[in-house]
Amino acid sequence: MTLSPYLQEVAKRRTFAIISHPDAGKTTITEKVLLFGQAIQTAGTVKGRGSSQHAKSDWMEMEKQRGISITTSVMQFPYHDCLVNLLDTPGHEDFSEDTYRTLTAVDCCLMVIDAAKGVEDRTRKLMEVTRLRDTPILTFMNKLDRDIRDPMELLDEVENELKIGCAPITWPIGCGKLFKGVYHLYKDETYLYQTGKGHTIQEVRIVKGLNNPDLDAAVGEDLAQQLRDELELVQGASNEFDEELFLAGEITPVFFGTALGNFGVDHMLDGLVAWAPAPMPRQTDTRTVEASEEKFTGFVFKIQANMDPKHRDRVAFMRVVSGKYEKGMKLRQVRIGKDVVISDALTFMAGDRSHVEEAYPGDILGLHNHGTIQIGDTFTQGEMMKFTGIPNFAPELFRRIRLKDPLKQKQLLKGLVQLSEEGAVQVFRPISNNDLIVGAVGVLQFDVVVARLKSEYNVEAIYESVNVATARWVESADAKKFEEFKRKNETQLALDGGDNLTYIAPTMVNLNLTQERYPDVQFRKTREH
């Protein structure tokens, strides 16, 4: 049976994100992936500060200065017969919920681990998020050109700490100065490493067969013997790769390599296009939408300001779930019940924009947004439904924000509300006074907000500490009890950027006591967009 042209396009798509701890090499891998997909001609190695060659995927002012990727960029490139969409997530102090929400827009993740360090804190957090949807995970053990931990230990650590089985696909031969290459367990081939070829794709010498004398000649008898001994252990002790278990999120295929040395990334990409799922179905509040449906649907998972410093614009990122986008199409924005004509959607190669003529499930579109689109918005061809599972998280850090120039209160509020719609930060306005409280998931978000208020809204703001430990969204089915709760707790209540009522607790003890005192009121840690 041959697939229709539409279904062929759907089957070609692979949409994934990279998750890692800061400095495990995510930006470098992103570049090398693009290099293998021929999307960039030479990879700009991630830079020392002040160098002119910025990595392709870091593009807001502050990112350029700090050498970190703050915002989620989207890059599409061809690989073999597939079209791959890579969503880049912020790496540092995991900037914000942006990262978590980006993971709701992908069908698969690549986990990058620094093989000298093993599983680190941020990786654990991000893995918990992927677990909510049983997202399939591929693993890349990076930095083999440095001295690394014992590979068996690394696999054990991933299995024990992240509760996912490991199925090694390739296995390293030596490491650091003695790194010679990797052996492919399923192809029975050894790929030999040459140093210093980071910017170009190198011709790799391949030795067929584990017992081939050429292998001993190429890597030395000691390392060849060590490889054979290790493989006996590995094959006895680790999982075999099984595609069904991979798709269920129960085992992860593991690849070894060095992104900086441009080695091993293509083995992982081969696995990604062979095994990762084509665009998956999604839940809405009324039914499940399949990618094979020809009517268009999509949801907004992120809003980003100023992708173009020359224009004060904001772009909403939409993941296409079903149907084909065509230029000039009329779509229903379900939340406000309005039909909008979308004629100038964008596709990205981080920061380079080009207008799209068409897009298919799995693709990410950029919609120009003048404040009318919010995170979580669903677009359809008329059907009234809403995609679920795009979360807002209660912030963990709070500061009061105030102006150096009190006359700019209006600009400050506008800036904060826009930044909160974008998911860069959350803003709370206490009911009983005129304070503005900013809530964030990571410390760096506070700096980002002040920098962006200054550069985009021309507002100079400073922070003060504030007596808030945590926040919860509150609601109740019992109107009478809710009124009483609101009356008695007025000093602890605030409205967030979307005017949702929030309880801001000075201490965790206070929160627990208040929850006990008002059993009819729900205190929520997350809120659906």
Curated annotation (Swiss-Prot):
Does the record carry rRNA-binding as a key word?
Answer: no
| InterPro entries according to UniProt | EF-G-like_DII (IPR053905), EFG_III/V (IPR035647), G_TR_CS (IPR031157), P-loop_NTPase (IPR027417), PrfC (IPR004548), RF3_C (IPR032090), RF3_dom_3_sf (IPR038467), RF3_GTP-bd (IPR041732)
Q: Which residues bind GTP?
A: 20-27, 88-92, 142-145
Q: Which PROSITE patterns match?
A: G_TR_1, G_TR_2
Where is this chain primarily localised? cytoplasm
Q: Which Pfam families match?
A: EF-G_D2 (PF22042), GTP_EFTU (PF00009), RF3_C (PF16658)
Show where the tr-type G domain sits: 11-280
Q: Which GO terms describe its cellular component?
A: cytosol
- Which is one GO molecular function term here? translation release factor activity, codon nonspecific
Q: Which Gene3D superfamilies match?
A: P-loop containing nucleotide triphosphate hydrolases, Peptide chain release factor 3, domain III
Q: Where is this gene product found?
A: Cytoplasm
Q: Which domain of life is it from?
A: Bacteria
**Which PANTHER family does the record cross-reference, listed alphabetically?**
PEPTIDE CHAIN RELEASE FACTOR RF3
Q: What does this protein do?
A: Increases the formation of ribosomal termination complexes and stimulates activities of RF-1 and RF-2. It binds guanine nucleotides and has strong preference for UGA stop codons. It may interact directly with the ribosome. The stimulation of RF-1 and RF-2 is significantly reduced by GTP and GDP, but not by GMP.
Q: Could you tell me what this protein is called?
A: Peptide chain release factor 3
State the encoding gene. prfC
